[in-house]
């Protein structure tokens, strides 16, 4: 260590500086401090002044240095050499002007003729407000990010039920919880903040129960691990609901006032069957919360106006007959009564046979939940006023918290499973209450939000922005993106009768549909930061073949493929045009309230990235690429009235763009107004970037304490949210115990509803799965599988030290994970004749993989699992030939099918029939030992030649004292 007396001390300190920015090594987006000496990155640590991670940093975050030093960096635009196949990495370097001119000419022609022939799909990019705006201005509906492949079931299932969801838009209040139940969550989800919260929760005496097929990461520190079979969480949740209702351990007051539980549903066979009965003599007032519904007053024994503060006499259960009046003689039932009937048969014994959890443990868990919610309830002395004008002196705390993610979502039954979880939380009265689930801005929003997607071909016109958003939240069949014949308008078939509520699109079906020209042919597919030729796809083998598929004339079936990435991934080798992106330490970027911010429970939080070091070579941020293309193509939002360029570059766009002229709402919420003294709303501030940079690159607006809770119904908060542009209306957001939205689709399927109808071959599918109440069904793949031949479930999860496939080129993180194993319960391995550390075959009906196995008691016997995306194609990411990642690493993707047979009509996406969520946790497999004479190398093997632009970088790195050797 240098002492102040050392002559070198002043030189080192004078040349050392610290800059703050936002991490991008996973989706957590922690605040970081980057230490530089002589302009070179020396060290990265957590920023203790950042509200999200409070100085905590993980292995990924501190290893960002080696992201900069990656041998896989792309540094110049590349064009595939004419006559060479995709996948060969046969490129020639071109200038940015050549790249822009090529794209401008091609995209201008598409936009002027048929905008649908351009498709833009992105990975975990954290900039969907910009990419979505670009797609809408272009005029193409064919846009989405990776959510349909990731966790749309979690987002949609909860948003359609309670108006918010886990992760960016809400989470568990572990500061005040007494019991915490985590389901289906791996280490990558909300990583550092969750670790910080869990450590405090455990130290304060909280009880932590983890329900997961695998005991790793978070589960390892749980007080109790309850192993469960994959895809069966819904059955467990329904059994818990059954027990709580049977024992009358529910929050009656909360359900009557803040949910649609007491609302009366029509039972008669008519066009109103299954819908809430409405008074035709009263106005609806608004479509989100109709003011003309009924409840039943059990004291007076008459139907009464539903929307009132006087709810104590409302019946939660019961079936009634309407008296004289517009609905005389009609049979009605409360929504809660329908839920009670739905779960009546969902006993712990029923769930136990499905989940593998003993009935007694299910009963005990229900009692634990109720005990925490009611016996350990408390009050905070916070006065607030509800939406109906009622004054409350305190906020009630229900200290039982949940968290769940992809383990529930990535199944074809995930939407209804997540609905069941949201309803369980609601029965306990935990929604936006201390110790329970709490929203994060910009949520809560209506159920669903008032964002409607393209729903008609007339909204798509040449040289014209879309007439609606490319992505939205359908509320009726009329909101579907289908043509006059009921056929899909979008390439991925999102918002069609196949997957009506696909709020995040179906990125995983884009390549297959484009090659098969189903529903039509496209011209140009642009992919940003999505490794769809490897791990970010359902079946890697088939997709790699499809990317190279040609027609009878020898032309590629996807005529033009553009890939933007910072690194030489497997996907890059298939591109016709490669656009080299910057790293997160080389660019401006923002985590916007308009997109997926990093808000806290107490108020909106957004953040930025600022350049720490200059870009390498000729790298250019994809954000800049979009701004440049939008300006050249003269999109209305990017040009002045006389057709001139409106924004100089991406930073200028972020500062000056407003959602509507004069709205005062832009991408960043902090330091708005001419003097930078306004928050959330205000005129553009030319010095906004500088103000973020001087304030740790983060803006945290702390709301007054009276706005912290009960925000679905908190009059003060709702007024504030509307004024600040977080919501469109001030109406309360009632919890949808019963989803009338789902019933509208079911009515159409049964022919009871006028208007749009599903194609005949999909009627039964829609009628079955669009149950307005949650129910459990086996994953769809099970119906196409001989389960006795494939008795095991196979799943993946991300390790703490790696994210997607981004980190195998990171010299530090490779030392933690250079290859992966298949983890098998010792009993299962013994029965299959497989030794610990031995080579084995994993087979599904769709494919097979040879890999190494390890026995582990931290996995339930019916499941095998591995780390996601550790395996690599030989040569990709500029790893040396024969690297462990290629020779010993493997993917389970080779075992998964993108499509399933659909009776009598061909094939359909292997996805949730409601949301289109990829069902990549549904695959069934069998295992057997590899023969002794087989090569000890994983199968299948593939080769990805390194691009010419990356081959000059060294493959063996030693980083010390600012040097790279």
Language-model-detected regions and their locations in the chain:
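Extended redox/cofactor-interaction regions of prokaryotic respiratory oxidoreductases
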Residues: 131-209, 235, 317-323, 335, ...
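Short, glycine-/Ser/Thr-/acidic-enriched flexible segments
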Residues: 28-31, 40-41, 47-50, 63, ...
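Long, contiguous, secondary-structure-rich segments that constitute the structural scaffold
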Residues: 610-612, 616, 622-676, 751-753, ...
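Glycine-rich phosphate/diphosphate-binding loops that line cofactor/substrate pockets in enzymes
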Residues: 100-117, 170-178, 342, 365-381, ...
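N-terminal leader/propeptide and maturation segments of large enzyme subunits in energy/redox metabolism
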Residues: 80-96, 249-364, 463-473, 477, ...
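Glycine/threonine-rich phosphate-binding loop and adjacent beta-strand/alpha-helix elements that clamp
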Residues: 171, 585-614, 625, 630, ...
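N-terminal export/assembly segments and adjacent metallocofactor-ligating motifs
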Residues: 1-318, 327, 331-332, 358, ...
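A glycine-rich phosphate-binding loop feature that marks nucleotide/adenosyl-phosphate handling sites
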Residues: 124, 257-260, 368-369, 385-388, ...
């Amino acid at each position: 260590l240098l002492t102040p007396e050392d002559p070198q001390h002043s030189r080192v300190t004078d040349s050392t500086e610290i800059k703050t920015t936002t991490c991008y090594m996973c989706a957590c987006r922690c605040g970081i401090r980057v230490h530089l000496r002589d302009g070179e990155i020396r060290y990265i640590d957590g920023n203790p002044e950042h509200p999200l991670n409070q100085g905590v940093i993980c292995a990924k975050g501190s290893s960002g240095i080696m992201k900069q030093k990656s041998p896989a960096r792309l540094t110049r635009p590349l064009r595939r050499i004419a006559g060479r196949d995709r996948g060969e990495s046969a490129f020639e370097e071109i200038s940015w002007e050549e790249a822009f001119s090529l794209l401008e000419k091609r995209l201008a022609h598409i936009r002027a003729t048929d905008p649908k022939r351009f498709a833009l799909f992105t990975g975990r990019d954290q900039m969907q407000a910009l990419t979505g705006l670009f797609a809408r201005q272009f005029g193409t509906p064919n846009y989405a990010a990776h959510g349909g492949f990731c966790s749309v079931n979690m987002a949609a299932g909860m948003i359609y039920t309670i108006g918010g969801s886990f992760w960016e838009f809400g989470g568990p209040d572990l500061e005040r919880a007494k019991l915490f139940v985590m389901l289906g969550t791996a280490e990558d989800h909300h990583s550092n903040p969750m670790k910080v919260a869990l450590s405090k929760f455990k130290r304060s005496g909280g009880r932590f129960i983890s329900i997961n097929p695998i005991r790793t990461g978070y589960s390892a520190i749980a007080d109790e691990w309850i192993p469960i079979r994959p895809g069966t969480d819904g059955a467990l949740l329904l059994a818990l609901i059954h027990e709580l209702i049977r024992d009358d351990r529910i929050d009656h007051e909360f359900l009557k006032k803040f949910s649609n539980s007491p609302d009366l549903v029509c039972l008669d066979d008519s066009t109103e069957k299954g819908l809430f009965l409405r008074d035709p003599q009263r106005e609806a007032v608004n479509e989100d919360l109709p003011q003309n519904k009924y409840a039943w007053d059990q004291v007076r024994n008459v139907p009464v106006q539903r929307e009132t503060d006087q709810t104590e006499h409302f019946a939660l259960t019961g079936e009634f007959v309407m008296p004289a009046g517009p609905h005389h003689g009609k049979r009605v039932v409360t929504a809660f009564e329908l839920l009670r009937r739905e779960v009546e048969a969902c006993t712990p014994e029923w769930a136990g046979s499905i989940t593998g959890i003993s009935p007694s443990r299910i009963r005990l868990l229900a009692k634990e939940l109720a005990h925490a919610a009611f016996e350990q309830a408390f009050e905070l002395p916070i006065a607030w006023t509800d939406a109906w004008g009622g004054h409350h002196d305190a906020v009630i705390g229900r200290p039982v918290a949940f968290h769940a993610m992809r383990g529930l979502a990535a199944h074809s039954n995930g939407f209804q499973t997540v609905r069941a979880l949201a309803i369980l939380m609601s029965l306990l009265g935990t929604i936006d209450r201390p110790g329970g689930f709490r929203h994060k801005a910009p949520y809560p929003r209506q159920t669903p939000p008032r964002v409607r997607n393209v729903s008609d071909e007339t909204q798509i016109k040449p040289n014209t922005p879309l007439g609606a958003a490319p992505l939205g939240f359908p509320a009726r069949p009329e909101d579907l993106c289908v043509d006059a014949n009921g056929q899909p308008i979008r390439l991925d078939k999102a918002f069609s009768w196949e997957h009506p509520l696909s709020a995040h699109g179906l990125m995983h079906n884009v390549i297959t549909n484009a090659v098969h020209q189903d529903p039509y042919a496209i011209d140009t597919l642009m992919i940003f930061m999505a490794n769809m030729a490897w791990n970010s796809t359902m079946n890697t083998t088939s997709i790699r073949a499809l990317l190279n598929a040609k027609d009878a004339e020898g032309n590629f079936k996807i005529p033009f493929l553009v890939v933007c990435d910072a690194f030489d991934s497997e996907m890059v080798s298939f591109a016709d045009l490669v656009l080299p992106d910057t790293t997160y330490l080389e660019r401006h970027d923002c985590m916007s309230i308009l997109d997926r911010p990093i808000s806290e429970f107490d108020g909106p939080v957004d953040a930025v990235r600022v350049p720490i070091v200059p870009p390498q070579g000729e790298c250019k941020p994809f954000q800049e690429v979009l701004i440049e293309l939008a300006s050249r193509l003269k999109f209305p939002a990017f040009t002045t009235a006389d057709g001139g360029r409106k924004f100089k570059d991406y930073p200028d766009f972020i500062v000056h763009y407003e959602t509507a002229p004069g709205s005062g709402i832009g991408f960043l919420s902090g330091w708005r107004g001419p003097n930078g003294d306004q928050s959330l709303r205000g005129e553009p501030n030319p010095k906004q970037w500088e103000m973020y940079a001087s304030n740790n690159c983060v803006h945290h607006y702390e709301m007054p304490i009276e706005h912290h809770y009960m925000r679905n119904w908190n009059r003060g908060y709702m007024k504030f949210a509307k004024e600040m542009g977080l919501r469109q209306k001030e109406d309360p957001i009632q919890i949808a115990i019963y989803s009338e939205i789902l019933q509208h689709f079911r009515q159409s399927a049964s022919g009871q509803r006028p208007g749009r109808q599903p194609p005949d071959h999909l009627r039964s599918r829609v009628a079955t799965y669009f149950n307005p109440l949650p129910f459990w069904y086996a994953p769809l793949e099970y119906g196409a599988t001989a389960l006795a031949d494939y008795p095991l479930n196979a799943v993946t999860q991300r390790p703490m030290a790696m994210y997607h496939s981004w980190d195998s080129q990171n010299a530090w993180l490779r030392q933690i994970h250079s290859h992966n194993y298949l983890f098998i319960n010792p009993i299962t391995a013994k029965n299959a004749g497989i030794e610990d550390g031995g080579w084995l075959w994993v087979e599904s009906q769709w494919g097979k993989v040879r890999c190494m196995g390890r026995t582990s008691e931290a996995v339930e016997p019916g499941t095998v699992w591995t780390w996601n995306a550790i395996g690599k194609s030989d040569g990709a990411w500029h790893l040396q030939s024969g690297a462990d990642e290629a020779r010993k690493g493997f993917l389970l993707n080779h075992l998964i099918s993108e499509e399933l047979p659909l009776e009598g009509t061909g094939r359909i996406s292997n996805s949730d029939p409601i949301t289109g969520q990829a069902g990549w946790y549904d695959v069934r497999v069998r295992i057997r030992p590899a023969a002794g004479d087989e090569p000890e190398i994983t199968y299948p093997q593939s080769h990805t030649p390194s691009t010419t632009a990356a081959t000059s970088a060294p493959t063996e790195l030693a980083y010390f004292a600012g040097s790279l050797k």
